[in-house]
């Protein structure tokens, strides 16, 4: 893939960016009553309004040129064809195959992966429905009331986000919990109030060697065995893994092991066996609807022209702000409490994918890549960090997401929520001029020095860019579309930046060093051999933990 800075479209965008400095968004809107019509797209019941961005028709044309010159279409097609686009690990990237219901073969190393996918989905359907119906019972014959998913990273963030997002579809009386942190507090607090007789554990680890996951799994096993005895493990544990030997040694019946493959990256794995807690929570039909929604977005991504392609547009806008307008962060702001874990999920999906400084050909990048992503559900964020977005010195593009129809239509709650959703995008776009602030203060009775002292604090610069994503309602299909939209956005940006979105070498170094430090914490006779700071902290840990 080419160095993007050598492309003519990149140079044209760099020359174009300064021309927008005297065209703030409020001016662009006032000059063009059809701006919304020109800069929004609808796909089924999902609408992307990108009109409140610092763009003109020329900007979007240049960004489309950049996409074509960067090979966005070719790399997209290579992914769907099963080519090993994860070059540092020599792997295909085929999470999209997991949600493809068509009979068209998908080949990896010459073999069609569709039959294996279908077999695992059938296994998931049978198991999840058995748990939900009460046909699956624990060692004492009681039905399962609580499912505890033990995983970390992609084995946790995706499933917990979806289970929370689809709580309106959950089976009453069947609770799904998630344990990820190796801090013993997490599993200790989760197990409080649970009954071993009615609890099922799902251990999610592809290799069945992940330190955090296996530490928590063994603690859960000890808790269960202490109450029900060793033979109970087989009725109260299932594994989402490929390591049959380790799963069996743990005491799990390999008939209750759900496989996935090395062409499924962790942060893209909720569509695989890792999604079993989703299927148990909301039912397999709703899990299938989630897959179908994602597949619909996959088809749109493959077939829509660049100028009308939702993931491409979102991705290019991110490149525009990061590389040409100096933005180093992005906010994702869902105005739906069910989406309260969306930002955390997208943090991993985006930052672990595109937090890279090395190109596909091993060179250090000379441009900005992935941004810091954060967010909170509205209106909580409004009373937290929106101050900085409105009046701070950093440019932070925002994605606002909301459903038009609430699952909980209580009084005026949803109308108030959506009025804030709409007001924030307008306020960030328009701002408040000094003249407007002066008139407002004067109308409140202020004058003279008091007015002049307060005036600068009441000015909002505006021109803060936002996308608004409005869906009809948050249901499994729509959620699948939304997640796939962001997955493909990430892919588009990685293509433009000429980086690998599908490895994560940055997580390795700390884990390697932790293995060396662990025995030094557990055995005071070992002399630590690190830098003075690390050695000093180890000494303090020994002092404090000794009592």
Curated annotation (Swiss-Prot):
Pathway: Carbohydrate biosynthesis; gluconeogenesis; Carbohydrate degradation; glycolysis; D-glyceraldehyde 3-phosphate and glycerone phosphate from D-glucose: step 2/4
Entry's Gene Ontology cellular component terms: cytosol
EC number(s) given by UniProt: 5.3.1.9
Class in the EC hierarchy, top level: isomerase
Pfam families: PGI
Key words, A-Z: Cytoplasm, Gluconeogenesis, Glycolysis, Isomerase
Cytoplasm is among the record's keywords: yes
Location in or out of the cell: Cytoplasm
InterPro entries: G6P_Isomerase, G6P_Isomerase_C, Phosphoglucose_isomerase_CS, SIS_dom_sf, SIS_PGI_1, SIS_PGI_2
Reactions performed catalytically: alpha-D-glucose 6-phosphate = beta-D-fructose 6-phosphate
Family in the record: Belongs to the GPI family.
Function according to Swiss-Prot or TrEMBL: Catalyzes the reversible isomerization of glucose-6-phosphate to fructose-6-phosphate.
PANTHER family: GLUCOSE-6-PHOSPHATE ISOMERASE
Protein name per UniProt: Glucose-6-phosphate isomerase
Native species: Rhodospirillum rubrum (strain ATCC 11170 / ATH 1.1.1 / DSM 467 / LMG 4362 / NCIMB 8255 / S1)
